[in-house]
A protein has these predicted regions:
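Bacterial N-terminal signal peptides
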Residues: 10-24
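Compositionally biased alpha-helical segments
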Residues: 28-152
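N-terminal secretory signal peptides that target proteins for export/translocation
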Residues: 1-6
Length: 152
């Protein structure tokens, strides 16, 4: 009886420890979403002068792992080049982005106006697109096909 009691007790303790460690882990993502996820809203003009009102804007790109596998990335900043450095300009500080198209092998140049009024010209560091929600559904606008993006 004593051995059986010890086995049941050990199983109970193992279950309690497992539950105690899993509850905080399952609550963490919800906490992070409540604190840091700001939704961005922008008016986007494409190369054909079509304007789209986008909500929940993200910069989207796919990292190629193999010929058939990709890792999707949704960012709330713009990865641009400044010399040899990659600079991540947060959407929070951006007022407007004007896109100057380049050749097929050269990334487009972004003329970025910050909310502070400062401006700069930067080549895009990673080929990607702006994704968001419009009144008609989800929209994916490649950066090389854009003219302007104005954050609201």
């Amino acid at each position: 009886m004593s051995l059986r009691h010890a086995v049941v007790h050990a199983a109970f303790l193992a279950t309690a420890v497992y539950i105690a460690t899993m509850i905080p882990l399952s609550a963490e993502p919800t906490f992070a979403q409540q604190n840091g996820d700001k939704a961005f809203h922008a008016l986007v003009t494409d190369a054909k002068d079509m304007q789209t009102d986008l909500k929940n804007v993200v910069f989207y790109w796919e990292e190629k792992v193999s010929d058939t596998s990709f890792i999707p990335h949704e960012l709330k900043h713009l990865p641009v080049k400044r010399g040899t450095a990659t600079v991540n300009i947060k959407f929070d500080g951006v007022k407007q982005v004007e896109v100057t198209a380049a050749s097929e092998k050269t990334p487009p140049t972004l003329h970025i106006t910050l909310t502070s009024g400062k401006t700069g010209d930067f080549p895009l560091a990673i080929d990607g697109s702006f994704k968001g929600d419009s009144d008609f559904g989800q929209v994916d606008l490649p950066v090389h096909g854009l003219k302007k993006l104005e954050f609201k």
